[in-house]
Amino acid sequence: MIEERSSNIYPQKWVQMLLLLGFCVVLYFVNLGQWDLWNPDEPRYAQVAREIVNGRDWILMHVNGKTYGDKPPLFFWLIGLSSYLCGGFTSFAVRFPSALFGTLGVLLTFFIGKNLYSSRTGFLSGLILATSVEFAYLSTRANIDATLAFFTTASLLCFLHWYRLGKGEGEAKVPRRDLSVYGFYIGMALATLTKGPVGFILPLLVSLIYLLILKDWKGMKRMRLLSGMALFLVIVLSWYVPAVLKGGDAYLRETLFKHTVDAYAKGWTHVRPIYYYFYNFPMDFLPWFFFLPAAIAYGYAREVDEKRKGFLFLLVWSGVIFLFFSLSKGKRGIYLLPLFPAVSLMVGKLWDDFVSTAMEHFRHEWITFALYGLMGLALVAGVAIPWVVSMKFHSYLPYSLPMAFLMVGGSLAMFVLFHFKNYAAIFFLIIGMMAGGFFYTSRVVFPLVNPYKSARFISQEIKSRIQPGERLGIYSELGTGPYNFYTGIVPILELEKREDLLHFLQSSGRVFCLLKFRDFYSLQAMDGWPKVQLIARRGVGGNDIVLISNR
């Protein structure tokens, strides 16, 4: 009776897909270009794509006129194509690939949920993924990771489809199995062209460890590793070999070692402790992390072995990626995005059964605790947000009130609905709160803080003063990408040492330089420091930047 009654609140499968698509379009695409590209990644990636288009070199990428070997080209090709279709390198055009592949990733999650459990589980899981904090944010930002997550998820979907087709089905399914297993390798190849070796390491590790745990040796033999990896290499090397031939040994060393092996083993950027993700991931997967422990416990407790295999696949998927990046020296929260579909599916299955079956033990022992925790967090956050804003940014207090009302009101509404045991309404209330909060933040708050985050404003100061033939330099670790993009100046001279800066400012002609205010302040006390003119001072991201000139 419970399942029959609750099934009426869910639409048909094709309607579920359309609802997910429409939901993501509103959440990710509407007013996507309302704020500028923000440091450090967005304007740099946009500049790489623009130099590809302007230089008509789609093989060897450049930024600031120099060879760029940090990332493979696929994401930059997509930005270039998007900018061509949108009529220029606007914020919307540059972010469009991330929004597109974020949306497609939500739809892939729906299909995996449908494959493993039911279309209803897939529908709920898609909503969970779309409204998780980090996934939603990266789907509206010109970062590579939403695109990478799509291709790794597509690869694993093909693997799962191939594996399930191979269980107890006749030879009539062989062509479909072949198509699925080769789709697995094609997905890995495209993921590799998006972000390097991690694109094939993650799906391959997940699939092999899953088969190893199941002791399915025949499955490993049927994976067509030789022909599949040959197809993978053909796709990847069709770009990489010409790029190495053009870039030479230096490009080979940079792409093969510095940004892969060295970055993983030595962590020359973003070095963090091994336990970093244990406290970072829960924040990134809010609000759904509250229900993840219950989802894992519920998955272990299920009695049907075939259903356990589905849960095991999701557990291996998420666990392997979590462990892989935890062992890396360099860590960022965005690196874990490829595991978000897996944990969303776990939580989606929990919620599907929670609202449709009698899970008395889990309702009271696990989910009740998670719900009260979420209610408490929402209530505290709703009270704290306006208080913090009033203390530090008093003029912005009115803009914090809608978020405060949303959090406090949502918390109280959850409590009332929980009292009446309307669990489906609680789920959709959480979805609505997250969607409303994210939409308000990205469409109201982001444009509001844009003048303090964007490099465009100080770049306008440069463009209004610099004349043809005059040079622009940048001192210390500030990257050139944002200023290349917003000034259109290529190249910008990179000054790493004080001696370089001093020599630059002593040029006979007029020159301009960007540097941090703290560096400018300390350099003024140096003996022999030339007289310079302070032209502008602005906040760019978290940096206090000044523009100076020697004339």
Where on the chain are the PLM-derived regions?
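Membrane-embedded architecture of ER/inner-membrane glycosylation machinery
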Residues: 2-3, 14, 182, 186, ...
